[in-house]
């Protein structure tokens, strides 16, 4: 069997990076809630 998780930084950033989050209303809500919670890192990568 092949491994199910094959990490790629570029793919991850494009899907769940800061700019990807800011592109949609729900993504902006995610960033906002993480800011309000006091997260040190708003997005992964």
UniProtKB/Swiss-Prot annotation:
One of its GO terms (biological process) is translation. Signal peptide: none annotated. Pfam families: Ribosomal_L34. One of its GO terms (molecular function) is structural constituent of ribosome. The keyword Coiled coil does not apply. GO terms for cellular component: ribonucleoprotein complex; ribosome. Keywords: Ribonucleoprotein, Ribosomal protein. Belongs to the bacterial ribosomal protein bL34 family. PANTHER family: LARGE RIBOSOMAL SUBUNIT PROTEIN BL34M, MITOCHONDRIAL RIBOSOMAL PROTEIN 34 FAMILY MEMBER. This is Large ribosomal subunit protein bL34. It comes from Opitutus terrae (strain DSM 11246 / JCM 15787 / PB90-1). The gene is rpmH.
């Amino acid at each position: 069997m092949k491994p199910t998780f094959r990490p790629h930084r570029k793919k991850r950033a494009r899907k769940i990076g800061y700019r990807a989050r800011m592109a949609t209303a729900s993504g902006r809500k995610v960033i906002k809630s993480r800011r309000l919670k006091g997260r040190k890192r708003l997005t992964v990568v």
